[in-house]
């Protein structure tokens, strides 16, 4: 669909193929309570140690968020103190940060349906780049303006799981967030034209349990393709009035979890670990290939993890798929394990997912405990990547 004239996309901009993401959600949960998983997971306290742990296993690229709701408590007034600390420590530790400007949360006085949402967000984006470049004048800056617009528009617009707590407004929320997303890119590029954009959206598979029925097939395919509305708006294929451009669809991050494939009619999740595979389950390689065929852009597995006892098995499964993708010649630029450190549930902060490669057992000290099997799986994954000389 696209050529490579507008961006040096043939060059991988990431320091390491394996990446780690720190939970930074700061939204209002299903009960209307503000969550701060950056603080709840202890990342604020263990920031330096967390980076040291990742350096020890040669993960040098991470995802962090600025937490919009904490940066802008008064309209157009910004407190960058915590962001400055992350920038300084990451620079000192030689860690590359990919920045989320909005990771589910917005200031108390805003929702995506607020008439000033896009303006507030775009000014935030501009001021972030100005602040960042005042501290780091050189080098590449990679930004995700809004994480998972597709999921967030469903959660807040259709499922009443976060602000604006609506039903039947998913498209309106998505449209408004994409207006903000694009205006944010425009203002960031005014400050720094070299900025790279990594979109991060769920990669899903929706199928019918009645493939002999043409109407069921068409309905499942329609639902499946809705995952690409955000991408199509961003590159201007649909909703051109929002000023999307092909070059804005720069690096495509796909967030892929164990429950990302389901049956349209029943919403039953397709099992991922069966041998031989469930006949309706698509490999990650197949899903990634379909994204590349559609857009022709480099791809990153921008989030993946599994809770509980199967997390190491999941890492091995993802490693196998990534190696298969790389051997096929598709431009897979990286794989990010998210969360890299355990986190509590948004709606029940007493329940911990145990999905990171570092566990939190003592919820008072929030001390990190390595999950030995997950660490081993990561190290083996790294060996396979090195054997392919992806980062020779």
Regions found by a protein language model. Give the residues of each.
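Non-catalytic scaffold segments within catalytic domains of secreted glycoside hydrolases
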Residues: 2-45, 51, 55-57, 71-392
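Oxyanion-hole/transition-state-stabilizing segment in secreted/luminal serine hydrolases
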Residues: 64-70
